[in-house]
């Protein structure tokens, strides 16, 4: 009797991990050439969209407004607002290099923040608070500043649930990301999908700016910023180059095993069809750089390597292996930047005439 009892399982954690290990995805990536890859991408992309919940049926006017312009020494920082939906405003910082000439149009990059204080972190804004200074330094977080100093125009928005858009009133100290997901699910909405929508509206906004070459847009981000970069680049082909830092992994690794995710990172039902490697494969043949720290406790490096092999397969099928760069560095959960900045300069230089590929 006792031996029979010990063979039973009542752990939900083990139950879900077993389901993950035994699952047979309905849309595995097996494409070996360009035509097969395109066909697979169309099928898998449709399933990713399904997992993002109900989205607006059409785009509303942006109604852009610049509410502040600050001299930051080597660049201008504008505080801008625009509508992603009729009743939803996106607050963002637009960083403009001071050497931008009259009539010049440059490449622009969407700098996606991770968990923390939203757009302030990637722009290096600490408000004099020690914990912000420490967190920004530890994660090498202000990549929006690095990019504007490299000559790019940079847009850094607050995603829904973060920064000025943080959800208040989570009862009993519950995780606000999880509460946001639960509230959204009551309406058939998904905060990841809504943020992807807002990311698309960010690209729309950049394309209205006279300083921006609307055909040369990029996207970068660390952690949840990597989530946003991955999904936005996978779903919107206006993203011509992407840098995903400390996010690409497997759901079996960082999510089901470690529980290192939250309610704004959930493409519902995705494991029926594939995993994050397959989502990243949707970006091929556009240039993609993936950063991963060997000492990142939240994203096991062995699981990242599994996902990277899926991505490599896609770029081989696209005859574009030179457009995928994997930077595995000695470090933890942080923006690396040593290879990715050179990658951006190669595939999406600030000035069109500087492209070297």
Predicted regions and their residues:
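Glycine-rich nucleophile elbow surrounding the catalytic serine of serine-hydrolase chemistry
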Residues: 221-231
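Short beta-strand/loop motif that positions the catalytic acidic residue
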Residues: 283, 290-292
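Alpha/beta-hydrolase fold nucleophile elbow
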Residues: 211-223
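Glycine-rich active-site/cofactor-binding loop and its immediate structural neighborhood
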Residues: 69-130
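Mobile cap/lid helix-loop segments that gate and shape the active-site cleft of serine hydrolases
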Residues: 179-186, 194, 201, 239-281, ...
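N-terminal targeting or regulatory segments adjacent to alpha/beta-hydrolase or S9 domains
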Residues: 1-76, 84, 353-357
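C-terminal catalytic histidine-bearing segment of alpha/beta-hydrolase fold enzymes
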Residues: 309-357
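Cap/lid segment of the alpha/beta-hydrolase catalytic domain
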Residues: 104, 110-197, 207-208, 253-257
């Amino acid at each position: 009797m006792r031996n029979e009892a010990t063979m039973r399982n009542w752990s939900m954690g083990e139950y879900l991990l077993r389901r993950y290990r035994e699952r047979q995805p309905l849309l595995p990536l097996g494409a070996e050439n360009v035509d097969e890859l395109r066909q697979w991408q169309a099928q898998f992309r449709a399933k990713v969209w399904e997992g993002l919940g109900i989205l607006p049926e059409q785009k509303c006017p942006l109604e852009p407004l610049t509410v502040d312009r600050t001299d930051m020494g080597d660049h201008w920082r504008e505080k801008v607002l625009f509508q992603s939906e009729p009743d939803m405003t996106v607050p963002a910082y637009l960083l403009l290099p001071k050497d931008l000439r009259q009539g010049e149009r440059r490449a622009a990059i969407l700098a996606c923040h991770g968990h923390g204080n939203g757009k302030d972190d990637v722009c290096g804004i600490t408000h004099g608070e020690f914990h912000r200074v420490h967190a920004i330094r530890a994660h090498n977080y202000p990549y929006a500043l690095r990019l504007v100093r490299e000559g790019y125009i940079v847009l850094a928005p607050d995603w829904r649930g973060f920064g000025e858009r943080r959800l208040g009133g989570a009862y009993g100290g519950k995780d606000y990301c999880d509460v946001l997901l639960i509230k959204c699910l009551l309406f058939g909405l998904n905060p990841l999908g809504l943020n992807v929508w807002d990311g698309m509206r960010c690209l729309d906004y950049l394309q209205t700016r006279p300083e921006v070459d609307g055909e040369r847009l990029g996207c970068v981000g660390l952690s949840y910023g990597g989530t946003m970069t991955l999904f936005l680049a996978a779903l919107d082909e206006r993203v011509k180059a992407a840098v995903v830092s400390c996010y690409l992994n497997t759901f079996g690794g960082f999510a089901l095993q470690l529980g290192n995710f939250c309610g704004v990172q959930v493409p519902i039902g995705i494991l029926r069809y594939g995993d994050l490697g397959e989502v990243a494969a949707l970006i091929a043949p556009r240039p993609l750089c993936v950063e991963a720290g060997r000492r990142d406790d939240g994203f096991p490096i062995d699981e990242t390597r599994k996902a990277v092999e899926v991505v490599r397969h896609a770029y081989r099928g696209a005859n574009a292996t030179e457009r995928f760069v994997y930077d595995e560095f000695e470090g933890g959960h942080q923006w690396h930047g040593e290879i990715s900045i050179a990658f951006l300069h190669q595939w999406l230089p600030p000035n069109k005439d500087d492209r070297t590929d």
